[in-house]
Amino acid sequence: MLYRLHLDLLDSQPPIWRRLWIPGILPLTDCHRVFALTMGWEVTADYWFKPALSSSVNPPHQPSLPAGSTLADWLLQPGDSLIYLYQPSQGWLHKVTLEAIASPMEALTPHPLPEGWLAHCLEGEGACPPAFCHGVWDYLELLDRLDGADDPDYDGLWQRVGYDFDPDRLDLVAINQRLHTLRMDSDGVSHNQ
């Protein structure tokens, strides 16, 4: 079965979120790869998952979920959620909420995915924060500084993020191009270039 998930970067303003279809049987280790590519993060970064308070399966005092777990082990019904922490040292907290469970035919009608594609992003909002930001609060400070031409580092900051950076821009085509390089095989998710 496919899971329609809402992936939300917590505490971000402007909002940064993605909605995607992903197999419920996917191990959390592979979910990290999908989520990182969906958001625009690095797949090699550290991460962990833990149950959210709204989950119908919430083991007490479990700091993180076992790596061999799948989405289906923890997200049983729409409304269940997990916390996904990307780069724990920087604190990029995401809430992963199960919105729907459907068969591949139900999920992707009228636009079925080509054979072998593992995940597909339907929509979202907001650009991925630049890699040099140390958490959402640093990103929000960067946005404030980019908005103020009187900042002494204004030009340097724009050079660092790139003059084409737009925090409100979401490139759905680029996200899906990254996602569609992923394939599921007997060893888990592979990245085909």
Residue ranges of model-derived segments:
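Short linear regulatory motifs enriched in tryptophan with gly/pro/ser
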Residues: 1-193
